[in-house]
């Protein structure tokens, strides 16, 4: 950004070049509520150009060996790590998350996504069988699909964008990606590194803009046979409808209403500290955050008291202050939506123990217009309430007692979502038993957010379609072909 410019102005990255866009969208600094960046408002014209560039690059890129592609991915990881602090500062300012979270989670994981898939693509095996009575040998081949359309969300901007780009290009596809228009800066910064990393023009194309314009043009494009999307269930329905006429491969990672089940024999100290983190990390703007907490009745009073005390020690404030645990929510509209659930809770007779409407948040004068909200704990909520049924996606969690194991499993499953769950107990038999019965794609016991990227990631029910990670990403971003050779 030049000194005479008021705003940072982003450009699309198409065919190895930065391309200005005549239409621009305001992007806000969540910590101040002020415009600080202009993002392309791309539409069909820009998406079409990106798809053409990706199609032209596909034959040569897909013909490269996995080892050659792996070297390019590792080089990009090196370049991101070399500029780690620049990416950290940009991600924090653009998204509102704390600089500590961006430094410890977002940017290191973004680089690691490239390293992980650079390695894993070298170690996949295919199937083979011999039919002696027919004199035939059968084997499978995995081939890249073509141009991959990738749409990533605003909560973990570079982290989830690279989670999609890395396996797509590692397996030989070319990419047209659309990050969220609210958090586009680190994707734009990554584009500045692609040529140096060794990506030929057109292998990775980034088109910025809104879902209704750029996103719709991408998912409905006849030359994009594959879509990977992370975001809301409502948007996923539209993507499914728009892509259906073209029979596209879809991977949809959607919302969650994730339960924590805390039995009386849980390690209470570890459980409380982890549940504070699982409920409120990144302002509660993680699809895996805990938003329903079921506590066995005999320890419910103790848990609730200690949980409220621990949550009040969780600091909310200016994202650039490394002592803060939470920063600002993504937008004014989202803040109002989340606060609306507190209004609903009070109208339904629930009790707010801490946070919104109970405690005061002191902010510097320049941040008064920012989108801040204290972590909020609510009790006395019915299972049928919107607070227990809908994804809030903010620093709000509900706590409720339970009596029996089968009862709490039934209540935990009684939502339309099925992304993740946590179970707290020292009884190994119980945690295995409960994990098997929970309708969730990921179940953590006595921990949260421990991830082996080799294992499948995704949800059940309205939390998504398909899985990604390790061999699941390899399978999604390739097509399998069976070959029979008679000898």
From Swiss-Prot:
Keywords attached to this Swiss-Prot or TrEMBL record, sorted alphabetically, are:
Cytoplasm, NAD, Oxidoreductase
EC numbers: 1.2.1.32
InterPro entries associated with the record? Ald_DH/histidinol_DH (IPR016161), Ald_DH_C (IPR016163), Ald_DH_CS_CYS (IPR016160), Ald_DH_CS_GLU (IPR029510), Ald_DH_N (IPR016162), Aldehyde_DH_dom (IPR015590)
Sum up the protein's function in the record's words.
Catalyzes the NAD-dependent oxidation of 2-aminomuconic semialdehyde of the kynurenine metabolic pathway in L-tryptophan degradation.
Which residues are involved in binding NAD(+)? 231-236
Q: Which PROSITE patterns match?
A: ALDEHYDE_DEHYDR_CYS (PS00070), ALDEHYDE_DEHYDR_GLU (PS00687)
Q: What is the lineage of its organism?
A: Eukaryota, Metazoa, Chordata, Craniata, Vertebrata
Instruction: Kindly report, in one word, the top-level EC class recorded for this enzyme.
Output: oxidoreductase
Gene3D superfamilies registered for this protein in UniProt: Aldehyde Dehydrogenase, Chain A, domain 1, Aldehyde Dehydrogenase, Chain A, domain 2
Name the chain's protein: 2-aminomuconic semialdehyde dehydrogenase
Listed GO CC annotations = cytoplasm
Q: Name one Pfam family in it.
A: Aldedh
Record-annotated site: Transition state stabilizer:
155
Q: Where in the cell is it found?
A: Cytoplasm
Which chemical reaction does it catalyze?
A: 2-aminomuconate 6-semialdehyde + NAD(+) + H2O = (2Z,4E)-2-aminomuconate + NADH + 2 H(+)
Q: Which family does it belong to?
A: Belongs to the aldehyde dehydrogenase family.
Any GO molecular function:
retinal dehydrogenase activity
CDD domains (UniProt xref): ALDH_F8_HMSADH (cd07093)
Q: In which pathway does it act?
A: Amino-acid degradation; L-kynurenine degradation
Which BP terms in the Gene Ontology apply to this protein? L-kynurenine catabolic process; liver development; retinoic acid metabolic process
């Amino acid at each position: 950004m030049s000194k005479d410019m008021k705003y940072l102005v982003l450009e699309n990255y198409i065919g190895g070049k930065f391309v200005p866009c005549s239409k621009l969208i305001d992007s806000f600094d969540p910590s101040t509520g002020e415009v600080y960046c202009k993002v392309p408002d791309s539409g069909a014209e820009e998406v079409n150009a990106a798809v053409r560039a990706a199609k032209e690059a596909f034959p040569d890129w897909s013909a490269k060996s996995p080892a050659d592609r792996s070297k390019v991915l590792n080089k990009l990881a090196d370049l991101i790590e070399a500029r780690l602090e620049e990416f950290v500062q940009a991600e924090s300012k653009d998204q509102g998350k704390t600089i500590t979270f961006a430094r410890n989670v977002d940017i290191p994981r973004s680089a690691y996504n490239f390293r992980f898939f650079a390695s894993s693509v070298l170690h996949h095996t295919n199937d083979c069988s011999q039919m002696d009575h027919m004199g035939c040998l059968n084997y499978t081949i995995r081939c890249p699909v073509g141009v991959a359309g990738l749409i990533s969300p605003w909560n973990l901007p570079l982290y989830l964008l690279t989670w999609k780009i890395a396996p797509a290009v590692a397996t030989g596809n070319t990419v047209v990606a659309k990050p969220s228009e609210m958090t586009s800066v680190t994707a734009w910064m990554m584009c500045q590194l692609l040529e140096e990393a060794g990506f030929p023009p057109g292998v990775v194309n980034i088109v910025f803009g809104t879902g209704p314009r750029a996103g719709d043009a991408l998912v409905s494009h006849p030359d994009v046979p594959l879509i990977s999307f992370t975001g809301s269930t409502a948007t996923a329905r539209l993507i499914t409808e728009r892509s259906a006429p073209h029979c596209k491969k879809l991977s949809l990672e959607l919302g969650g209403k994730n339960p924590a089940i805390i039995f009386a024999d849980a390690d209470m100290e570890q459980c409380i500290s982890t549940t504070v983190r699982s409920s409120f990390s990144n302002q509660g703007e993680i699809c895996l955050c805990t938003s329903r907490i079921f506590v066995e009745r005999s320890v419910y009073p103790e848990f609730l008291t200690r949980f409220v005390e621990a949550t009040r020690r969780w600091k909310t404030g200016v994202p650039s202050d490394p002592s803060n645990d939470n920063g600002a929510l993504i937008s004014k509209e989202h803040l109002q939506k989340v606060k609306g659930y507190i209004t609903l809770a009070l109208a339904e007779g629930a009790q707010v123990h801490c946070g919104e409407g109970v405690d005061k948040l002191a902010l510097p004068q320049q941040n008064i217009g920012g989108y801040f909200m204290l972590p909020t704990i609510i009790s006395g909520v019915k299972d049928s309430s919107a607070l227990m049924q809908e994804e809030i996606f903010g620093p709000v969690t509900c706590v409720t007692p339970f009596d029996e194991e089968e009862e709490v499993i039934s209540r935990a499953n009684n939502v339309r979502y099925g992304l993740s769950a946590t179970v707290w107990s020292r009884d190994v038999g119980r945690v295995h038993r409960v994990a098997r019965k929970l309708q969730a794609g990921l179940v953590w016991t006595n921990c949260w957010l421990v991830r082996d990227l080799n294992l499948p990631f995704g949800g059940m029910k309205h939390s998504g379609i398909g899985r990604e990670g390790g061999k699941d990403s390899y399978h999604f971003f390739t097509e399998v072909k069976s070959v029979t050779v008679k000898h």
